[in-house]
Design a protein with these regions (language model features):
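Conserved inter-motif catalytic segment of the P-loop NTP-binding fold
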Residues: 27-28, 49, 75-168, 172, ...
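The Walker A/P-loop phosphate-binding site
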Residues: 3-106, 130
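C-terminal regions of RecA-like/P-loop NTPase motor modules
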Residues: 3-6, 10-12, 16, 142-145, ...
Length: 344
């Protein structure tokens, strides 16, 4: 690739590195989780406390270490190492048991607890700080062939020079982190909490500056299911490099021997979007849908094509997402039959 140097005219006479697009090498996006978590890029996972965000990302990390299939059926990749930065959970009493419950290959899970530095009093351990330690983390990722770096939670690792609520401050930091991800090829998953502001677009619900989700190439909200508080949903908030991935749900299954819970993924996608889940559907609309579906079921016993149900519901003014919630509440199942689906 040829470097073209264009000299800026003016008092500063600075220099820019410029090259024509014809000399830019075409590249294909690589994926850790195909269609959801791009390799060499930044991804955000956000949610309220107690939505099992950390358990979720450790489940994903475990799959990377073993090459296990992805929850939506996407093919696994070759097993690889992961770097784990966790500021809120204990390594021995929480993180290791969760990794074991998820079936991780523990030897490939590198727990980045602190950095050893030389000081006036000799060798010292100090907490990891961003952006100060980005180059060090990148070297660690390269030396261990890590495919995934988890930062849980992002805010806990920010230097006091970084204002997480100021766009420019955050973007400068994430530009460095994104460059390190691109250089190493590792996906960087940053976990953060949702803010407390009700409503509004899903893009603006994450804690801190909008620059965080702006710098990420993919972002997901981890939310409680409005119909079942014990059920969680992972909904796409942003997807720059692939079509928006469908919402996927999961439950938590206790593992008494380890004293933690593991993720149990749903077998199919959920039709609701992040915006719908965050805004919530009116209880009156759901109640009307439940009443309508109860009556419809009484007049349509046995297995009925799902297309018929959707058509009849549409004529009654019930959107598919509300119908889905009503069907779940009533325990009406769907089944694959040949080329289509049936209910009953």
């Amino acid at each position: 690739m040829t470097d073209h140097i264009v000299t800026e005219r003016g008092a500063s006479r600075g220099e820019w590195d410029v090259l024509p697009a014809s000399e830019v090498a075409r590249e294909t996006v690589r994926w850790v989780w195909p269609g959801r978590i791009p390799a060499g890029k930044l991804t955000v996972v956000e949610g309220d406390p107690a939505t099992a965000k950390s358990t979720l990302v450790l489940d994903l990390a475990a799959r990377v270490t073993t090459g296990a299939p992805w929850p939506d059926g996407e093919a696994p990749s070759q097993p690889a190492s992961v770097l784990l930065l966790s500021a809120e959970d204990g390594w021995g009493d929480t993180i290791r048991p969760r990794l074991e419950a998820a079936g991780a290959e523990l030897s490939r899970c590198l727990c980045v607890a602190a950095r050893r530095v030389e000081g006036d009093e000799g060798s010292l351990l100090r907490p990891v700080v961003l952006p100060d330690d980005i180059a060090w983390i990148a070297r660690l990722a390269e030396s261990s062939n890590a495919a995934l770096v988890v930062v849980d939670v992002l805010a806990a690792y920010l230097s006091d020079r970084v204002d997480s609520h100021k766009d420019q401050s955050v973007r400068r930091l994430l530009a460095q982190l994104g460059a390190a991800a691109a250089r190493t090829g590792a996906a960087v998953v940053m976990v953060r909490h949702l803010n407390k502001a009700p409503g509004g677009p899903a893009l603006y619900r994450g804690g801190g500056s909008i620059g965080i989700v702006g710098a990420a190439r993919a972002a997901y909200a981890v939310l409680r299911d409005p119909d079942d508080p014990s059920h969680r949903l992972v909904a796409t908030v942003k997807s720059n490099l692939a079509p928006e991935a469908p919402t996927w749900g999961y439950g938590l299954v206790e593992v008494p021997a380890l004293g933690v819970a593991r993720i149990e993924w749903d077998q199919s996608a959920d039709p609701r979007s992040a915006a719908e889940l965050l805004a919530g559907l009116g209880s009156s609309a759901l109640g009307e849908a439940v009443a309508w579906l109860t009556e419809w079921r009484a007049t349509h016993p046995g297995e009925v094509p799902a297309a018929r149900l959707l058509s009849d519901a549409a004529e009654a003014g019930i959107p598919p997402t509300t119908l889905h919630r009503a069907r779940k509440q009533l325990g009406i199942e769907t089944r694959k039959r040949g080329e289509g689906w049936t209910v009953g």
